[in-house]
Amino acid sequence: MKIKLYNNYNNIERIFYKNLRKENLDNKLEKSVIHSRYMDSSQSIIVPENETLTIAKFPPNRFSEKIGTHPDFIDESLLPKTQYICSIFLDIKGSTRLALKYDLETVQKIKNAVLSTGIEIIRYFGGHIHRLQGDAIFAFTGHSKLLKSDAIIQAINAASVIQYMNQNILKKYFENVLGVSSLKIRIGIDFGDDDEVLWSKYGIDNINEVTVTSLHADLSSKLQNKASENSIMVGENVFSYLQLPDDLLSDIYIKGSSEEKDYYIMKHNSFNYKMKNFDWSKYLER
């Protein structure tokens, strides 16, 4: 990573420090000399409780304050309704190693600090957190007053900065402080247009939620599953709608093969839907 890249995003580390301190991890890990030194060295970085995320070259564009129902559909009388959305599915691998070394309460605090920082980044770029699923985040970008292209860009920005955070901030903390392997974050992004996304209510009485019925929302999870460690996979609608430069996209290979490429996330009769690996590092350095 270039130094200029770190300088652009160093506020992310400050926010991560803040989230760690919120969890009072000093007390839980006080026997760790390395952790004590790490926290002592960060004392010079005074992070006020009210400090919010600020990312150079990316202005804040916060849209949603709550998890669950998308703000466009709080009024359930509007449902069912078709409306585009860009879906982000983020999964964190490797946190189980924490449970082999630390007690459950400590593991929960560490994981929450990581997830909280990821949530703040997604919200910073205009994302809406729809659901937390264990070590995974399911989120949306886009709303009725936002251009579709901007929604896709928001998703790409959020996912790229999260991968940057993992490689440059979390990796250092997990390996040098916690003494475990760094996390592996995989992200899938896909876009469904107006005629490809139906918003409606699922469930009964007081046990229900407003969510989407969309192949492309489902594919964001499948794309995440296809992604390699610390990478982002995007669906065909994403890279074709934005006409992303070829140098930011690459094909992946079928598992176990170094020659046969895996072009499609879904191949069924006449529906052949492509996927690409997105080079988030090169994107951020532009």
Name each model feature, range by range.
Residues I67-D72, K171:
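Short gly/ser/thr-rich secondary-structure transition/capping motifs
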Residues S64-G68, F89-I92, F191-D194:
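Short hydrophobic/aromatic-rich motifs at helix boundaries and adjacent loops
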